[in-house]
């Protein structure tokens, strides 16, 4: 894989209704931009039940599925796509683990979260998940296609 292709890896992030209500969107975007990732898609919406169920389809048989769908559809979500080298893995590290109380200080959930059911942000857990989630939340024309990364970031 060429370096250019690696630098163009994309991930899906969504600031959940609790993070939006608490005014954390700007802080979260700033963290990813300061890391060197490029914001290539951004929108705010209240997800439909169908979108939420499709997004969390892997959890359909889990006991928390109904509550998760209800929560994510309870208010505005800020959906984002970031691009950059290793962005999927880096974004997950920056988010922290699912339970905010177990997340390291310095991570988004470690710094701002207090409850596993209100953990502020979703991030894709693999390149494959990112591709699926991006396609679910964004139309191709809603994403920037020609992004020139800062030349000081990569060799």
UniProtKB/Swiss-Prot annotation:
Subcellular location: Cytoplasm
Catalytic reactions on record: a 2'-deoxyribonucleoside 5'-diphosphate + ATP = a 2'-deoxyribonucleoside 5'-triphosphate + ADP; a ribonucleoside 5'-diphosphate + ATP = a ribonucleoside 5'-triphosphate + ADP
Entry-linked SUPFAM superfamilies: Nucleoside diphosphate kinase, NDK
Entry annotated with the keyword Transferase: yes
Active site per database record: 122 (pros-phosphohistidine intermediate)
InterPro entries, per database record: NDK-like_dom, NDK-like_dom_sf, Nucleoside_diP_kinase, Nucleoside_diP_kinase_AS
Pfam families: NDK (PF00334)
CDD domains from the UniProt entry: NDPk_I
Record-listed ATP binding positions: 16, 64, 92, 98, 109, 119
Entries under SMART domains matching the protein: NDK
Function of the protein: Major role in the synthesis of nucleoside triphosphates other than ATP.
Subunit-structure text: Homohexamer.
PANTHER family assigned to the protein according to its UniProt record, in alphabetical order: NUCLEOSIDE DIPHOSPHATE KINASE
Protein's UniProt name: Nucleoside diphosphate kinase, cytosolic
Organism from which the protein derives: Dictyostelium discoideum (Social amoeba)
Encoding gene per record: ndkC-1
